[in-house]
């Protein structure tokens, strides 16, 4: 399910019939999310590094303040203000103090079949809703923001066969933490589980 779903999503976003692991494709992005951890860096690059800057489609952007709420220093407050002002100036959906960015995304934006870039490593959690989400850095986020596209390396898939029933008091979180403990924090980098 996971592997075929990711392949179908990437193929559709790339406008091709099929893709295979290891391929690199230019894709159209359905949504881009950034939080207060790095948005100020993207805004600085947009304002200071681009000639004739523009945003491809502001309706695809979501900015969420969730990492430092309330702000813990004047520097953080200034970064969040920069983010807030940029969102207002460009009519970008802006959320502040409404929850963790990924929960806001899951409850309000993520739809099955979408390809989503987020400036956060937990963006891959959107796979739980049948979307392809991946975390990117500021430069890739900015490129996606101004072009509406980016590149994607089609990930390999890792299949985990789980059998049996979880004992009482053991939950999905315990299961994934056990798997991560066994494979290591980097055990499935750029792979779909």
Identify the role of each PLM range:
Residues 1-193:
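Fe-S-dependent hydro-lyases/dehydratases of central metabolism
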């Amino acid at each position: 399910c996971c592997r075929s779903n990711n392949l179908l999503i990437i193929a559709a976003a790339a406008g091709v019939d099929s893709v295979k692991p290891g391929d690199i494709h230019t894709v159209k992005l359905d949504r881009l999310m950034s939080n207060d951890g790095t948005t100020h860096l993207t805004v600085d690059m947009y304002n200071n590094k681009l000639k004739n800057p523009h945003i491809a489609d502001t309706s695809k952007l979501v900015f969420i303040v969730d990492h430092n709420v309330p702000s813990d220093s004047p520097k953080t407050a200034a970064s969040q203000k920069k983010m807030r002002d940029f969102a207002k100036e460009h009519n970008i959906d802006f959320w502040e103090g409404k929850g963790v960015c990924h929960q806001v995304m899951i409850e309000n934006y993520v739809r099955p079949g979408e390809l989503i870039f987020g400036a956060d490593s937990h963006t891959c959690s959107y796979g739980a809703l049948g979307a392809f989400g991946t975390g990117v850095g500021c430069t890739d986020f900015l490129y996606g923001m101004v072009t509406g596209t980016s590149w994607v390396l089609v990930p390999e898939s890792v299949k985990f066969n789980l059998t049996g029933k979880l004992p009482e008091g053991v939950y999905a979180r315990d299961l994934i933490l056990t798997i991560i403990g066994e494979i290591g924090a980097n055990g499935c980098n750029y792979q779909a589980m």
